[in-house]
Each structure stands twice: as structure tokens, then as C-alpha cells.
Amino acid sequence: MAEKHDPDLIISDIAMAGNMDGVELCHKIKQSEALNHIPVILLTGTTNNEIKLQGISEGADDYITKPFDADLLLARVQSLLKNQTQLRKYFLDSITLKENTQKVPAEYQDFLKRCIQIIEANLENADFDSQYFARAMGMSHSALYTKIKGVSGQTLTAFVRSIRMRRAAVLMLTENMNITQASFQVGFENVRYFREQFTKLFGLTPSDYIKKYRHSFNKDLNTMK
């Protein structure tokens, strides 16, 4: 169900009817590369620390003992969703070459690096598509789509396009390529479409972007204000 609906957060009771309890559900979610970015809150009616430790060891993001105040649950939910928003900001800042000092788990940094490496390595590969991308990442297409959507807020197609435009920005800033050269280099055949999409992503036209950042681009691939 989580793979189908792609929730922002999951709240589960430890005691559930059926063959799976909340701890097992949490384990399945956190073991799934497509879903492990989704925060999980476990609810329990017991004060048994062993059960709580088991849930935490399976990756639960928070634990709330019943009975609980509704405002407490709301506050915990808002806190976890804020973390998700910060994660998406990290991805957007990284894609648009903005410096971001916030700390995110290494697994997300590594995931983004892998995505960028694979997409940039296949800029001239006519066979590269979302299925090819998924295979290169060692994931199913649906798992990769869900993961990308969850951590970046973008569809798989939009994410790949954003990484291509990221590379174009680097080429314009470091290789002195003009807009047409850079757009063709990363696989855009329609320069007008490239300009439109670039402006949406970076908030500046390619020309204005070059003027603003060509002389303030650091070795870590960040634009400096």
C-alpha cells in the first residue's frame, strides 16, 4: 500500500490485526530502498523498553506511548515532516549548485551522488531512459520512481532533466560554453525548451545565470552569493 500511495509519513500501532505487527511493518519499510526515506512513528500501549528498543533498531523514527495527547502526536508529525522538507531542500540545492550546510544522512548524499554520476555518464547514450537508469541503480523502475519522488519531490523524468540542466550550468560556468552549446551537450535539441526549463529550475534565465555566477563559482561546484 505504501508503494502505491507514496505517503509522506506512516503511523502504525505496534499491535495490529493480521500476520504483521508494527515492528515488522517498520522493518519492511526501512529495508525497502524505495520506501526507507518515509518516516515511521510507532504507537504502543506498553512501557516495555525491550519492545521499544526493537522498534528503534528496526529504524522507527519516533515512538509514542499510549495514551497520548493529540497535540504531542501532531508536534512529532510536524517535526518529522519538517525534516522531510529539509531533505528535499538539500536535494534541490545540490541539483541547482547552491551551497547547503545542513546535515543529511550519508545514505541520501550517496544516493544523490550515484544518480548524478549515472545520468552524467549517459548524456550521450541514446539508449538511456528511465528503465536503463533504474537498472544502473540496481533498483526496479517503480522503486526508483518512488524513491526519487519521495526525497526530491520530482518525478523521475523531471529529476533526470534537472540533472542534465545541472551539468549544462557547470559547462556554461566552467567551460565557457554558450547556451546553445551547453544545451546540445547535455541532450536538449530544442534550445527554447532548454531555456524555459532552466529558468524554472534555477530561477534565472541561462544568460542571467551566467552573468551572475561565472566569476563566483567555487571548486566544490557551488555558486557563491
Language-model features, listed with the residues they occupy:
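Terminal helix-turn-helix DNA-binding modules in bacterial transcription factors
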Residues: 150-189, 212-225
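Basic/polar phosphate-binding segments, predominantly the helix-turn-helix DNA-binding elements
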Residues: 130-159, 183-205
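The C-terminal output helix
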Residues: 78-93
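A Lys-centered signature of the CheY-like receiver
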Residues: 64-66
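C-terminal output helix
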Residues: 68-77, 89
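Alpha4 helix (beta4-alpha4-beta5 surface) of REC/receiver domains from two-component response regulators
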Residues: 20, 24, 31, 36, ...
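Active-site beta3 strand of CheY-like receiver
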Residues: 5-11, 16
